[in-house]
Swiss-Prot record:
Record: residues binding Mg(2+): 8
Biological role stated in the UniProt entry: CRISPR (clustered regularly interspaced short palindromic repeat), is an adaptive immune system that provides protection against mobile genetic elements (viruses, transposable elements and conjugative plasmids). CRISPR clusters contain sequences complementary to antecedent mobile elements and target invading nucleic acids. CRISPR clusters are transcribed and processed into CRISPR RNA (crRNA). Functions as a ssRNA-specific endoribonuclease. Involved in the integration of spacer DNA into the CRISPR cassette.
Keywords: Antiviral defense, Endonuclease, Hydrolase, Magnesium, Metal-binding, Nuclease
Gene expressing this chain: cas2
Full protein name: CRISPR-associated endoribonuclease Cas2
EC number: 3.1.-.-
Subunit field text: Homodimer, forms a heterotetramer with a Cas1 homodimer.
Cited InterPro entries: CRISPR_associated_Cas2, Virulence_VapD/CRISPR_Cas2
Organism: Dictyoglomus turgidum (strain DSM 6724 / Z-1310)
Superkingdom field: Bacteria
Amino acid sequence: MYVIMVYDVNQRRINKVLNTARKYLEWIQNSVLEGEITEAKFEMLKREIEIIINEEEDSVIFYIMRTTKYSERQILGIEKNKREQIL
């Protein structure tokens, strides 16, 4: 499956969330990561993130796509992390 992760967390936890997510997904730009991931690894990622965040203050959103066949990425402005693979 293909996952896009978007997060808005307290500044004290940003680095922990980013470093954890980068073990599974590719950093795209500030607070956004994406990539192919197995369901098992996705569950591991969610468990690790749940341990880090404070659910009273922080927000993490996962967009899950079973296929990227019909998706397209359009970028306005600079691309923060240039990639070969297009969503």
